[in-house]
């Protein structure tokens, strides 16, 4: 941005305080009301009233949350038991799952899912390999004559 004035420092060489009065009046944080968030409940309260949310005073007061690192977070891609029952025969014909002893063997990680939920119903016996399964999903698959085997997620 264009400066429309000359800096006074050029003309104040040798004056020790450069127009700021006594020594120390323009040093450190005393002239600005303190360092950082100091004084927001005292002499800087007008800033809180102007810029903070009414009632909470956010972002000047309160906890502000925590964002987990992406290496810890898992993006869940769930599939319901009912959906699995509908597509299991199609997946067998496509060669994406195999059959052992009259039961279909399904690895959800290979199909792009990492969680098994209990929505819907199933009447086909399946052996499901999954990192996470809900309690109802495990019960429904066991009632249909199958089983759920928990495997680790490789990141």
Curated annotation (Swiss-Prot):
GO cellular component: cytosolic large ribosomal subunit
SUPFAM superfamilies: Ribosomal proteins L15p and L18e (SSF52080)
InterPro entries, A to Z: Rbsml_uL15_N, Ribosomal_uL15, Ribosomal_uL15/eL18, Ribosomal_uL15/eL18_sf, Ribosomal_uL15_CS
Region (Disordered): 1-35
Domain of life of the source: Archaea
Role, per record: Binds to the 23S rRNA.
Family to which the UniProt record says this protein belongs: Belongs to the universal ribosomal protein uL15 family.
UniProt subunit comment: Part of the 50S ribosomal subunit.
Protein's UniProt name: Large ribosomal subunit protein uL15
Organism from which the protein derives: Pyrobaculum arsenaticum (strain DSM 13514 / JCM 11321 / PZ6)
Chain's gene name: rpl15
């Amino acid at each position: 941005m264009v400066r429309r004035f000359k800096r006074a420092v050029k003309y104040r060489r040798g004056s020790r305080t450069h127009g700021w009065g006594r020594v120390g009046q323009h040093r450190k944080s005393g002239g600005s009301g303190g360092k950082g968030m100091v004084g927001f409940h005292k002499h800087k309260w007008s800033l809180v009233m102007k810029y903070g949310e009414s009632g909470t005073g956010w972002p000047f007061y309160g906890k502000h949350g925590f964002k987990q690192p992406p290496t810890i977070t898992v993006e869940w891609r769930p599939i319901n038991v009912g959906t699995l029952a509908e597509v299991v025969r199609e997946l067998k014909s496509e060669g994406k799952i195999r059959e052992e002893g009259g039961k279909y063997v399904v690895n959800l990680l290979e199909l792009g899912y990492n969680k098994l939920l209990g929505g819907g119903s199933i009447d086909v016996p399946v052996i499901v390999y999954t990192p996470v399964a809900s309690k109802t999903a495990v019960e429904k698959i066991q009632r249909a004559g199958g089983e759920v085997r928990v495997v680790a997620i490789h990141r």
